[in-house]
Amino acid sequence: MNYVKTLLDLYRLKRQAKLDAKRMRVLQEKKLRTMLHYAWENSTYYKRTFEAAGITEAQLDDLPLSCFPTIDKKVFLEHFDELVVPQDLCLRELREFDAAVSADRKPYKGKYHVVHSSGSTGKPGYFVYDEAAWNSMLLGMIRAALWNMSMPRILSLLAKRPRIVYIAATNGRYGGAMAVGDGIDGVGAKQMYLDIKTPLNEWIRQIKAFQPNIIIGYPSAIKILAELVEKGNVEVNAVRVISCGEPLGASLRNYLEKSFRAEVVNFYGASESLTLGVEMNAEDGMILFDDMNFIEVESGVMYLTCLYNFAQPLIRYRISDSLVLKAAEEGSPYPFTRAVGLLGRNEDILWFEDGSGNKEFLHPLAIEGFCMEGLLDYQFRQAGKDAFEMYAEISGSVSKDAIRTEMLEQMRQILLEKNLDYVQFYVVFVDEILPDPRTGKKPLILQKGETWQDEKSVIAG
């Protein structure tokens, strides 16, 4: 991203937040109809499914969005190749690329940004952004990160070249890591990645050396940094804390605000659309960016229509988050819809303690990237101060011994990186792993008391 162009485009995007609610609805509707026509003309999948639903091209201009067919991740992956618009994209080649090429921010084929979903609803998927969509998303993300800041204040902040640390799962094609890195580049700031797999003593060393003044990351990971600050292990003079990737509860928000004595921005995004909304305080709710997405809730189910990604149109795509929508009211400071009661994934962190009382954590996303033939799904549960279990669902055609061997190799490496080689790791084979019926998401970490009774094998420790 060109620095000057980024600032000019950001200024234009910020101006849209000053529209009144009526003009925002007109803008959103115009973008929606453009996307519907584009999908009809360029996506084999959408034209076929629209026609199957009895929708004609003439109706694309005025038929309510609720009349259009919905899509979920399963259908999306099954029909990936006929849904995407570019002819040089196919799911098989994307999976080969993901498996063969080490994850970095370089675009696939030099022009596509491939986001690997974290799999909180089951099997991981791939979401593709072309350069135009990626840049639109980055501008929305920058607008959210600097929410409630005037352009003069933003220019003053950026002139000092802020030092930004991103604390999350950085080793993979996770949208957050890729987007944050490109966004920081776009505003000319200094950056440091702090992976959740890094041992705590290394956290302390790197934070002391880098001295960040803006913190971005999972709230569960930022909380650990706040605790290090509270204990006096490190000193952080932050001007802004940006929480993303997990829900941010009111109590944790208060704790982070007090610990860092800084504004806390709660950023909302998903792999399907990395820029969905922003929240500055829990009482007002989450502001949803109606100029970038069209979000519906029907019978408690959320559907997303992304208005800026024309390479991979997502129209009425089911998202497993749970929320209640509240339309912008007359006199509201912003023209956007608000989400009340947003429920998304909020993983527990696994904490372990060695015989000398030294503690170390393992974030669930550090152990979420398992990929091996025959392993269909998995969950984790802590079994003690120095042990945890993995519940594995495998296909009937593979050997349990083969899964054990591969799992042993991968997990030992992860535990070694975190100085957790003393931790015992078990595998439990189960028939099926199902999502939580309340949220529709698969909890990666089972709570205490939630167990499977099945075959158990010690494979590490």
Locations of regions flagged by a protein language model:
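Nucleotide 5′-phosphate-binding alpha/beta core
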Residues: 1-116, 123-144, 151-154, 159, ...
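Residue-level signal for inorganic ion chemistry
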Residues: 39, 117, 164, 215, ...
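AMP-binding/adenylate-forming
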Residues: 130-135, 139-141, 163-221
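Short, hinge-like loop/turn segments at secondary-structure boundaries
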Residues: 183, 232-234, 282-286
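Short, structured coil segments at secondary-structure junctions
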Residues: 187, 237, 259-263
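Adenylate-forming
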Residues: 195-202, 212-253, 266-272
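AMP-binding/adenylate-forming catalytic core of the ANL superfamily
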Residues: 215, 315-419
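Conserved AMP-binding/adenylate-forming
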Residues: 248-330
